[in-house]
């Protein structure tokens, strides 16, 4: 059971359900999820890098290498139980938000609760890289960040 302490953090509830559902019904070999999950990732990495969280070093390193070749900037952040502890509750299994420090990591740790230990998983927080603002060289709108890297990863490792 999840204690909802912040109704504005609803996306992680849905994403957690989807992660569990996908494992249960589709039996994937690995999982990628991409979400504009936290504004805090913009504070951490700006609008140049996507935040990458993974429970599997090999899978993550393969993907980061593909990102580099694809010119899609990505930076790995830790999945650390110290941050996950911020989700503990005395009245439920966990809460949907933790403290203000490391909140992108805390959000990823929330999602980690819905991923089976043996399932290789990458969470990409793309809040900073998902949208362009209009400049001389770009139009206002979605960037499609991750499409090239995901395609190249699947082509190389599937």
Residue map of PLM features:
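A generic structural signal for tightly packed, nonpolar segments enriched in small/aliphatic residues
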Residues: 1-158
């Amino acid at each position: 059971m999840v204690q909802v302490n912040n109704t504005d953090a609803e996306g992680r509830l849905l994403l957690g359900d989807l992660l569990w559902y996908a494992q249960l019904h589709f039996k994937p070999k690995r999982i990628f999820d991409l979400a504009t999950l936290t504004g805090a990732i913009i504070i951490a990495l700006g609008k140049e890098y996507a935040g990458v969280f993974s429970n599997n070093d090999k899978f993550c390193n393969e993907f980061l290498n593909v990102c580099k070749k694809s010119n899609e900037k990505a930076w790995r952040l830790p999945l650390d139980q110290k941050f996950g502890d911020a989700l503990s509750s005395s009245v439920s299994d966990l809460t949907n938000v933790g403290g203000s420090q490391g909140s992108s990591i805390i959000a990823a740790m929330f999602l980690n609760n819905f991923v089976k230990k043996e399932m290789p998983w990458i969470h990409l927080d793309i809040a900073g890289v998902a949208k362009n603002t209009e400049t001389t060289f770009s139009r206002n709108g979605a960037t499609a960040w991750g499409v090239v890297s995901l395609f190249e990863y699947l082509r190389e490792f599937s």
